[in-house]
């Protein structure tokens, strides 16, 4: 009974949190989700020559192609962010940002770095959830019209988004024998599984948001590193990418897990 009471109290707290924040939580989620694209687009502007020279040196593609790559990244990311925040052409913005992720994965050789690849996939999961949200908003004007068959892609996008989001947490697992690491791995893995299968989803996602935010502020405190040091840019990139995954989790909290989840199946039982 003690465990049931504790779980019930936690779920009541999560429900109360949602009631208080439901008006602005989706907006905060979107801002967090696109923050890494916004930061990267601004960085492309201020580090234009460095980014161009890096691409030119890595791929030996010449000044013109390297400059075109940087310009495409800058324009694509900033335009996508503006469209998402203004809720205009959100689906096109998501597809454009998907393209940016794929382009950067190849250009910066992220494909061969498992940790960064998993984080990019997690970022793609957040965009999938945003795409699912935009589809539901687009259909809201037809409330009352049967759309069971049409809503199916949205449900599977939510499932795919949830599964991809948990990849971020797999990069945070520590494989050492310390007591703290073992406890953190067990709790984190349990929460990841709950989010992926959609069981107690909002509570698990909200708990992961708090946990990931604390880890992010502690380990990626780029503001404590002088701007001229390379570690500053590395931590800043990591910080905002993690914030984007937090945004995806906040969308899960705000919108729920979708139809393909244990929470929804329980209602049918």
Curated annotation (Swiss-Prot):
One of its GO terms (cellular component) is endoplasmic reticulum membrane. The chain crosses the membrane at residues 64-84, 92-112, 179-199, 203-223, 239-259. One of its GO terms (molecular function) is cargo receptor activity. One of its GO terms (biological process) is lipoprotein transport. Disulfide bonds: none annotated. Keywords: Endoplasmic reticulum, Golgi apparatus, Membrane, Protein transport, Transmembrane, Transmembrane helix, Transport. It is a multi-pass membrane protein. PROSITE patterns: SURF4 (PS01339). A motif (Di-lysine motif) lies at residues 266-269. It is found in: Endoplasmic reticulum membrane; Endoplasmic reticulum-Golgi intermediate compartment membrane; Golgi apparatus membrane. The di-lysine motif confers endoplasmic reticulum localization for type I membrane proteins. Belongs to the SURF4 family. Endoplasmic reticulum cargo receptor that mediates the export of lipoproteins by recruiting cargos into COPII vesicles to facilitate their secretion. Acts as a cargo receptor for lipoproteins bearing both APOB and APOA1, thereby regulating lipoprotein delivery and the maintenance of lipid homeostasis. Synergizes with the GTPase SAR1B to mediate transport of circulating lipoproteins. Promotes the secretion of PCSK9. Also mediates the efficient secretion of erythropoietin (EPO). Found in a complex composed at least of SURF4, TMED2 and TMED10. May interact with LMAN1. Interacts with ZFYVE27 and with KIF5A in a ZFYVE27-dependent manner. Interacts with STING1. Interacts with SAR1B. Interacts with TMEM41B. PANTHER family: SURFEIT LOCUS PROTEIN (PTHR23427), SURFEIT LOCUS PROTEIN 4 (PTHR23427:SF13). This is Surfeit locus protein 4. It comes from Homo sapiens.
């Amino acid at each position: 009974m003690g465990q049931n009471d504790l779980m019930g109290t936690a779920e009541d707290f999560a429900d109360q949190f949602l009631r208080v924040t439901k008006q602005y939580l989706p907006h905060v989620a979107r801002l967090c989700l696109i923050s890494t694209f916004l930061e990267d687009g601004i960085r492309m502007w201020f580090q234009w020559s460095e980014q161009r020279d890096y691409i030119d040196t890595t791929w030996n593609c010449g000044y013109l192609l390297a400059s075109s790559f940087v310009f495409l990244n800058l324009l694509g990311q900033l335009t996508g962010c503006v469209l998402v925040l203004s809720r205009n052409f959100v689906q096109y913005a998501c597809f454009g940002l998907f393209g940016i992720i794929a382009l950067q994965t190849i250009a910066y050789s992220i494909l061969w770095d498992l940790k960064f690849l998993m984080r990019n996939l997690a970022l793609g999961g957040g965009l999938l959830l945003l795409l699912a949200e935009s589809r539901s908003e687009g259909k809201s004007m037809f409330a009352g019209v049967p759309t069971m068959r049409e809503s199916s892609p949205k449900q599977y996008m939510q499932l795919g988004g949830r599964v991809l989001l948990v990849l971020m947490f797999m990069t945070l697992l520590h494989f050492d024998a310390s007591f703290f690491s073992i406890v953190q791995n067990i709790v984190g893995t349990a929460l990841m599984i709950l989010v992926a299968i959609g069981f107690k989803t909002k509570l698990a996602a909200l708990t992961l948001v708090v946990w990931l935010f604390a880890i992010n502020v502690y380990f990626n405190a780029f503001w404590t590193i002088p701007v001229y040091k390379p570690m500053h840019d590395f931590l800043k990139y990591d910080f905002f990418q993690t914030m984007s995954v937090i945004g995806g989790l906040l969308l899960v909290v705000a919108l729920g897990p979708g139809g393909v989840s244990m929470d929804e199946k329980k209602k049918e039982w």
